[in-house]
Amino acid sequence: MDPSADTWDLSSPLISLWINRFYIYLGFAVSISLWICVQIVIEMQGFATVLAEAVTSLDLPVAIINLKEYDPDDHLIEEVTSKNVCVFLVATYTDGLPTESAEWFCKWLEEASIDFRFGKTYLKGMRDAVFGLGNSAYASHFNKVGKNVDKWLWMLGVHRVMSRGEGDCDVVKSKHGSIEANFRAWKTKFISQLQALQKGERKKSCGGHCKKGKCESHQHGSEEREEGSQEQDELHHRDTKEEEPFESSSEEEFGGEDHQSLNSIVDVEDLGKIMDHVKKEKREKEQQEEKSGLFRNMGRNEDGERRAMITPALREALTKQVDAPRERSLLQTHILWNESHRCMETTPSLACANKCVFCWWHHNNPVGTEWLWKMDQPEMILKEAIENHQNMIKQFKGVPGVKAERFEEGMTVKHCALSLVGEPIMYPEINRFLKLLHQCKISSFLVTNAQFPAEIRNLEPVTQLYVSVDASTKDSLKKIDRPLFKDFWQQFLDSLKALAVKQQRTVYRLMLVKAWNVDELQAYAQLVSLGNPDFIEVKGVTYCRESSASSLTMAHVPWHEEVVQFVRELVDLIPEYEIACEHEHSNCLLIAHRKFKIGGEWWTWIDYNRFQELIQEYEDSGGSKTFSAKDYMARTPHWALFGANERSFDPKDTRHQRKNKSKAISGC
């Protein structure tokens, strides 16, 4: 017997693993994909799950159904006799449209509500409650889907057990401070209503003689009666008066008198009286709201003070973002404008007037068109920003690949990028903050979203002023940036014109999103003529994971070669500009005005010491001694130029190449 046959050979399983390595990789990839899908589903069904758990605690059966999988033609009529209470959680997306999962349900419901073949009693006997999710920053269609679903169901005869709830993502105007708090408050009332239904207790129905259901029977108390007789009484009231039992929110859109007109013929000469009556009631309602302080306290807490910009819900979201994995490039020395490892990234304003599809904060930050929050002083913001920057740098002590001299340099802030999140120019004391930076010998890089032209005109000199040009046409800008201003396109154009009169360095920042804004070259060229920027920075969009707030995917990230081709074609349309620099790692190219090409050499970099001298002279002269971008330019090193083999990687540094070079679906 051969003794070697009984000896376990380690090489055999290793060889087997190597041969089947692709199947192992595939298994890991599938497992990770399934895990990500599960996480997304859990996040999307968060509110529904919370509500289901609360209902289950009452010993009531409950089921969560995705509206995408729900056929209203077959199942809604079944709810008439089922005695179930149907709760609809619906969100309002761009332009007041429903989300993709609720699109068919809403379309069917709208058509059925106006189809005479269904009638006003088609769903009589069905019981429901609606909670809408929206953002009041978009006032023209705030919670439009929730309101419509509530209205359409009511028009088909559905019986409300609870008034419509409205969740508001805008932490400033949200009644309870966040959409989660809005939902919790509504859920508490809904659970109380279910408990009352269990006991056979119902709120006393209105007799139809009050204005919009504001009588005592809607505000106070309830009376005990048999559930069967209660429902008969309510159905009787509905048939005779066409009013809504229980609480209702659709009286805002359809009052008792308005609804009565649906069942009666109105003479043409009476329409004027009816419209006058409706307008009068609307004015009375607005006056009543003003007296109660709804308008006066917008953006304020219960004590009448301005709300803090960072709410508990927002702080939790910010913490998740800060804990994200840090990239190797954090301490890289060179980028388009020289050193970056000494650059502190911060913002005095988390708020923004846009909800861009590629925003890496996934719309957790507040939005608004004006400042509505408590304001921290510039001195405090700068002090804490420097401390937090230093604490972040300290985390890299001893990390492989981090050079000791750069670690020490990084502890001293030399530059400040006001671009972390939000719209820095919204901060009321932005000019004071900039002066503090310059007094500390810190250069300033400010990025604005081109929606505040007046603030751009009034801005003090900065080292470099960026304007985000995410699209070149009105339609594409609305699609990509999703701005809050109704006149967003005019604001955008005026902002670019305001940039043209600035004497310091100005930059257009173009973010390319494949299939969305890469085919508008002629329009981009026209926008360049408006602002006459010193530089145009063109960058491929960066993918920042899946988000329910955006449809952006990896497929929208352009390859670097595609960005280069776009830039070449754009330069052909703007003869005063040329391609100057390239940073392949950032998927970014720099187009510069020819005035920065002196003697055949590019001077696109910044002489920071000279800038500090110039800004000091400007301050000492009270603003009379001005200076221009050419006064503090520096020569661009050869390895940062477009076409150089280094592609902006400093030859003194060590370049780390990715070992796995498998084909990806995008340029990310």
UniProtKB/Swiss-Prot annotation:
Region annotated Disordered sits at 202-269
Domain of life, per lineage: Eukaryota
* Swiss-Prot/TrEMBL catalytic activity: N(1)-methylguanosine(37) in tRNA(Phe) + pyruvate + S-adenosyl-L-methionine = 4-demethylwyosine(37) in tRNA(Phe) + 5'-deoxyadenosine + L-methionine + CO2 + H2O
Residues that hold [4Fe-4S] cluster according to the record: 352, 356, 359
Q: Which UniProt keywords apply?
A: 4Fe-4S, Iron, Iron-sulfur, Lyase, Metal-binding, Nucleotide-binding, S-adenosyl-L-methionine, tRNA processing
Q: Which cofactor does it need?
A: [4Fe-4S] cluster
Q: Does the keyword Iron-sulfur apply?
A: yes
| Bias type Acidic residues, positions | 244-255
Which Pfam families did the record assign? Flavodoxin_1, Radical_SAM, Wyosine_form
Co-factor binding comment:
Binds 1 [4Fe-4S] cluster. The cluster is coordinated with 3 cysteines and an exchangeable S-adenosyl-L-methionine.
One of its GO biological process terms is: wybutosine biosynthetic process
Q: Where is the Flavodoxin-like domain?
A: 37-191
- So where does FMN get bound? 43-47, 130-162
Keyword S-adenosyl-L-methionine: yes or no? Answer: yes
> Bias regions of kind Basic and acidic residues — which residues?
213-223, 233-243
Gene Ontology MF terms: 4 iron, 4 sulfur cluster binding; FMN binding; metal ion binding; tRNA-4-demethylwyosine synthase activity
Query: What EC number(s) does its UniProt record assign?
Result: 4.1.3.44
Q: What pathway does this protein act in? A: tRNA modification; wybutosine-tRNA(Phe) biosynthesis
Q: Where is the Radical SAM core domain?
A: 336-580
The UniProt family comment states: Belongs to the TYW1 family.
Under the heading PANTHER family, the entry gives: S-ADENOSYL-L-METHIONINE-DEPENDENT TRNA 4-DEMETHYLWYOSINE SYNTHASE, S-ADENOSYL-L-METHIONINE-DEPENDENT TRNA 4-DEMETHYLWYOSINE SYNTHASE TYW1-RELATED
**What does this protein do, in the record's words?**
Probable component of the wybutosine biosynthesis pathway. Wybutosine is a hyper modified guanosine with a tricyclic base found at the 3'-position adjacent to the anticodon of eukaryotic phenylalanine tRNA. Catalyzes the condensation of N-methylguanine with 2 carbon atoms from pyruvate to form the tricyclic 4-demethylwyosine, an intermediate in wybutosine biosynthesis.
Query: What protein is this chain from?
Result: S-adenosyl-L-methionine-dependent tRNA 4-demethylwyosine synthase TYW1B
Q: Which organism is it from?
A: Homo sapiens
The gene behind this protein is TYW1B
